[in-house]
């Protein structure tokens, strides 16, 4: 068995004295693992870092075997990403979400989204919005996608302000007003075609929204905890926003 594909490295772990098990998200073969012989060498280690985009050759005697990878660098993103706590935790969060999907199942849309994320993840002002959108994509791929296109009660596409925790569908401000204390906030930037950027409060609302449905549909049924990286990502974002606010205050003074 043999195939060639490109992939983004999610992680590695040691195997024996000199080799490594490589975990990648590939364009056509989904999340895939393989053995890299000599993967702990000085030559290979810089290539096999999370966030790097690589050209992969996978070989195995049988399809169900772990197989071996040969990996060559296409884009060396790791050094840039490692300079940002937001980027490090963001990548770890997305990797944890991808592990919720069956190994070797192709998800081309997720690969394309991840490719975009890698380019912008070290921009802390954009990272929160990007990872929140990625979480919505993961929920959709898992079969628990939210319908944010129109009001569940009236069908209107205007002034959508809430999401029903029961149905996962958007609700307009007027229709949801009597139950607003029980509704989840729908940040405007998540609405298709809004063209709006996310402020810190909207980012918090977005992760509260996706976190609710991850807990209900994924974490609780599987008896697993939210990934630590997600909490680390949100903490890094809050620190970044607090620092920016403090700097802006000093400049204004």
Curated annotation (Swiss-Prot):
NCBIfam families xrefs: reco
Keyword DNA repair: yes
Functional summary from the UniProt entry: Involved in DNA repair and RecF pathway recombination.
Organism, as annotated: Mesorhizobium japonicum (strain LMG 29417 / CECT 9101 / MAFF 303099)
Family stated for the protein in its record: Belongs to the RecO family.
Keywords for the protein's UniProt record, in alphabetical order: DNA damage, DNA recombination, DNA repair
UniProt xrefs under InterPro entries: ARFGAP/RecO, DNA_rep/recomb_RecO_N, NA-bd_OB-fold, RecO, RecO_C
Example GO BP: double-strand break repair
A matching Pfam family: RecO_N
The protein, known as: DNA repair protein RecO
UniProt keyword Transferase, yes or no: no
GO cellular component: bacterial nucleoid
Entry's transmembrane regions: none
